[in-house]
Regions:
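Bacterial N-terminal signal peptides that target proteins for export
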Residues: 1-9
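C-terminal segment of classical bacterial N-terminal signal peptides
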Residues: 17-23
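N-terminal cap/lid segment of alpha/beta-hydrolase-fold proteins
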Residues: 26-85
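Gly/Ser-rich "nucleophile elbow"/oxyanion-hole loop immediately N-terminal to the catalytic nucleophile
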Residues: 79-86, 129-168, 175-177
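Short beta-strand element of the alpha/beta-hydrolase
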Residues: 84-95
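Short amphipathic alpha-helix adjacent to the substrate-entry channel of hydrolases
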Residues: 101-119
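The feature captures the conserved acid-bearing segment of alpha/beta-hydrolase catalytic domains
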Residues: 183-260
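Alpha/beta-hydrolase-fold serine-hydrolase catalytic core, especially in secreted/extracellular enzymes
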Residues: 253-329
Length: 329
């Protein structure tokens, strides 16, 4: 019965995707995407570029029925001999029509900063099943002496990142059997309640008040995100319902649904470096007396909350970002 429910949920998502505008269709990310952005934030600039690690990849499985017939692939940092240590794991969920093959450049970028990044080719990720299967296989590889991932993953430091309908998938994964294994979540233009209702997709509707881990929510100010996928009022409502004491949100100016993954990539990397790798430089984007995201003119509607921040208000961000300056991306 459980397997039948999974098939039905995936079928409903697939049917609904036929009604989505072609403008929302996934596309292959340019391997040189980091070159197109002129980031005004100093810390943002640092995490825009590739990190210090060479990156390799390995396919965990491909076309196995028990894993939904998807391909599962991992990108991981190559560590210096004698200096190896288990690295944080990041599970990714695609947007509608997306795949790890199309998004490979951003996964390589994240892995270059010391993360083991696991993705798949599931184009309908909202139910969260493929995220669970990705995690299962990554953790199995971590215990397999024949795998290049053997003892490479820190199983106490696992994050989840969901783009578009994958945002709903991230919430659903947290409510699943492995929810307590995740230490942080990032949603990137995550679908909100209104679009789920318009498409009659209950699997796209979730309860943010059940989330107790640190969360970063990013979106763009372009028309698709603003009017359809991640409207500001609903994004704020979701943010307010998150139960974690640590959270942040922001909307990247001049970015829309199709390029928000690359536009927000630097701050997503910084968030994960802070939350999963204790990077004290990266945390300055979101903490302290003057968090960079609140004064970065390339970001709008930014908010932060955490025990270390003394000025967690969006008013400052809105006043600073009120100009009409435009930035690359």
């Amino acid at each position: 019965m459980k397997h039948i429910k999974k098939i039905l949920a995936a079928g409903i998502c697939l049917a609904a995707s036929l009604y989505l505008t072609p403008a929302m269709a996934a596309y292959e990310i340019d391997p040189d995407y980091t070159m197109k952005y002129n980031d005004p934030g100093k810390i943002e600039q640092r995490y825009r570029w590739h990190g210090p690690y060479e990156v390799k990849s390995v396919v965990l499985s491909d076309g196995e029925a028990k894993y939904g017939n998807y391909k599962y692939k991992v990108w991981y940092p190559v560590q210096q001999a004698g200096r190896e240590r288990p690295r944080p794991l990041v599970i990714t969920l695609n947007g509608t029509g997306g795949s790890c093959d199309k998004d490979e450049p951003i996964f390589r970028h994240l892995a270059s900063w010391g993360f083991v990044v696991a993705g798949n080719t599931d184009a309908q990720t909202a139910p969260g099943f493929s995220a669970e299967w990705t995690l299962d296989q990554a953790l199995a590889a971590n215990q397999d002496s024949k795998s290049p991932l053997y003892h490479q993953i820190d199983e106490k430091k696992i994050g989840i990142v969901g783009y578009s309908q994958g945002g709903a998938g991230a919430y659903n994964t947290l409510e699943g059997k492995d929810g307590d294994k995740f230490k942080t979540m990032v949603t990137v233009s995550g679908v909100t309640e209104s679009i789920g209702k318009k498409l009659h997709l209950p699997v796209w509707i979730y309860d943010p008040s059940k989330v107790t881990i640190p969360v970063f929510m990013a979106a763009g100010t372009g028309i698709l995100d603003r009017k359809l996928i991640t409207p500001l009022d609903e994004m704020k409502e979701n943010y307010s319902k998150i139960q974690s004491k640590t959270a942040a949100m922001g909307r990247r100016k001049d970015a829309d649904h199709l390029d928000i993954q690359t536009a927000a990539d630097a701050y997503i990397t910084a968030w994960l470096r802070w939350q999963l790798d204790d990077d004290i430089y990266a945390k300055r984007v979101f903490t302290g007396k003057d968090p960079e995201i609140l004064r970065n003119p390339a970001w709008d509607n930014a908010e932060v909350r955490n025990p270390e921040t003394t000025q967690p208000n969006r008013l400052k961000s809105e006043l600073i970002n009120g100009s009409s300056r435009k930035f690359g991306g």
